[in-house]
Amino acid sequence: MLKKLVAGTLVAGFALTVGLGVASAEEKSNTIKSFDYLKVDEQNVNSLTKVSDQDKKDIQITMVLPEQNENGDWLAYGFTSRETLDAYIEKDKKALKNKINPLGSGAGSTDFYEHKDKGGQYIYWSSGFKNLPSSWNDRISSVSTASPSASYSTTLWEHTSTQGYGKGVVFKHADWYGKTANLAADWNDITSAIDVKK
């Protein structure tokens, strides 16, 4: 589906810019393809009771950790609802309150790119929920998170809020700052809403 880009339009804090960065070899290996769930709704999943295909269908939101298992699956926490994710985030923010060490005064915004490895045009968002404008709907292919001193996490939503959000994938800034997450087929070019939590 052909998307029209309206040049020069700023939408609620979005800035449309051309990204010219070159990605390192480490960033190129951060393609998010599949998950190995360690916890679902804060309940541990052990090696004997791996998450079944049916249980995976119940997982609505995945928090991706910056580590992979021996098969290349990304370690992750699963959540069956926005409420269980929000409860986890509130607990985790309290635990991290005095443990976040900023990497500098820099990036207070998460950058969303149209191509992998921070390629092509990008938009940035600093705080709060945003349904993407039509020019950016189903267009995001890679993410570079804000500093953990600026905000807690970035969530990509499959649908807009008026469409019920759909599935979500979360990147905690303390884990992902300084790295680029490339979105594989399951998430590439399907994001319709974003949320950067303080």
Regions found by a protein language model. Give the residues of each.
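Compact beta-sheet-dominated domain cores in extracellular/mature segments
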Residues: 10, 25-198
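Sec-dependent N-terminal signal peptides of Gram-positive bacterial secreted proteins and lipoproteins
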Residues: 1-25
